[in-house]
Amino acid sequence: MKAGLGLAAAVTLPSALAACREGRPDELTVAGGEPGGFYLEFSTLLAASLERHGVAGSARALSTGGSLDNIAELRSGRATFAVALADAAGQPQEPGAVEVAALGKVYENYVHCVVRRDSGITAISGLAGRRVATGQPGSGTSLTTPRLLAAAGLSTSAGGVPGKDGDIAVVSLGLNDGLTALKAGTVDALFWSGGVPTAAITAAGQDMALALLDLSSLLLELRRLHGAQYDRVLVPEGSYPGVPAVWTVGAANLLLCRADLDAATVERTVQLLVHHAGELIPQSSLGVQFLSPETLINTAGVPLHPAAADAYRELHG
């Protein structure tokens, strides 16, 4: 069952939001992610909903490399909103950097370690001495993957060539290029952090038999090194063709804005998240989402925008 759908069906946006056109921005932009991934799907749905319900005159989603790029787009002013992993959003800010704030936790990201089923790799330890796609530069995956490999006690080498001592050869490829390389045999594994199922992985599974590695044993070390922003989550059986249920590491996805975004836009967007959650869940999703009143405010230590906090208090007491 998709979280938030019951709420969305039972409640419509307050007439004050729908009727309020004065003072709304002409355009809003939502920094998303790579084609074939949940970030861009979610951002496109959010942009359409923002426009449909009059939060802005128009709204559009931006294709980006992922979380780190999105935060940079936000700070530069090129994006109004950004979707980002909690671990990326929670990194220490450089002195003088534009502050970001959360509007809410929107859904769970699942770290996928994808291998070919005939590779003989059945555990993360089997990646030693292999070529591994660790995420596109600017993506949240490119931040999370080195943390996972370090937690597993695996060392890496740059330049795409495995080291003599079993070092993993790091290849900076994102989702689509990484899947192409996996099919071609030029990488042995692909890391990707996204929703379940990720459409591009589903499509790739039609052409080659895939497997996912269990990463849940790394959780305690990850938390010891980086805090409690990581979770143990289950990729359900049937999420991908022929892939059984597998435990992995998850992290929350947050909807972010600049801390100086005007209160009216923030409040109207929060109302949309609460009252129209059903419009924001991709069709391909299994519904393992955070778009519910109980979880929206749990932003993994990233502060809520003051207007968002006020809106949640008004909506839920």
Labelled PLM ranges:
Residues 15-30:
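C-terminal region of N-terminal signal peptides and the immediate post-cleavage residues
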Residues 86-89, 95, 119, 157-255, ...:
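Pocket-lining segment of extracytoplasmic ligand-binding domains
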Residues 35, 79, 86-88, 106-108, ...:
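Solvent-exposed coil/turn segments that connect beta secondary-structure elements
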Residues 27-53, 57, 61, 109-184, ...:
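Bilobed "Venus flytrap"/periplasmic-binding protein-like clamshell domains
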Residues 48-55, 75-79, 150-154, 183-187, ...:
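Sec-exported extracytoplasmic/periplasmic mature domains
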Residues 74, 79-81, 99-107:
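Short beta-strand-centered segments that line the small-molecule binding cleft or hinge
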Residues 244-317:
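Segments of small-molecule ligand-sensing domains
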Residues 1-19:
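N-terminal export signals
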